[in-house]
């Protein structure tokens, strides 16, 4: 099993500095308009913006409880919401609707929409010249990003590289 730290798989930084927060998590006017179009309540505006900005940064949708508090505070402040506003607990239907709208807005395809074929082809071709699992995972990540496909869970990429490397 490859270690996630040895790959390019995106993760949150433990203690992001203000400059990083501003650069990666401040919503643009177009993003604020997008969020306002689909939400009314402050908690839902915060939630949709968190999902949007973290997806842009990571390439996949993290669980809301995995988002560092500093990121939540920064986005809440950027939206000019009160400190008491917390991310909404979304029902599955709402969460998946938000995911679909974010993908449409960013023009990114879901991994389930052909991502496995793209990643498998990239890993298969790269396996002819390299055999380090972390390198093969990086090849898959690079190809998925290039083709504007959402990244799957790290374990999915790890299993894929093990399956392709094993004759």
Q: Where do the protein language model's features map onto the residues?
A:
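Long amphipathic alpha-helical coiled-coil/heptad-repeat bundle
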Residues: 2-167
């Amino acid at each position: 099993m490859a270690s996630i730290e040895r790959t390019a798989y995106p993760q949150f930084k433990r203690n992001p500095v203000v400059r990083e927060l501003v650069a990666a998590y401040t919503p643009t006017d177009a993003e604020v308009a997008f969020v306002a179009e689909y939400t009314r309540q402050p908690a839902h505006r915060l939630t949709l913006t968190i999902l949007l900005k973290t997806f842009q940064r990571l390439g996949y949708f993290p669980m809301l409880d995995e988002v560092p508090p500093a990121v939540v505070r920064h986005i809440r402040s950027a939206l000019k919401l009160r400190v008491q506003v917390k991310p909404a607990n979304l029902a599955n239907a709402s969460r998946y609707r938000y995911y679909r709208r974010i993908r449409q807005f960013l023009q990114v395809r879901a991994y389930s929409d052909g991502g496995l074929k793209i990643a498998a082809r990239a890993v298969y071709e790269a396996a002819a010249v390299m055999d380090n699992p972390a390198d093969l995972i990086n090849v898959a990540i690079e190809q998925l990003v290039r083709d504007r496909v959402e990244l799957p869970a790290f374990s999915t990429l790890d299993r894929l590289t093990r399956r392709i490397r094993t004759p």
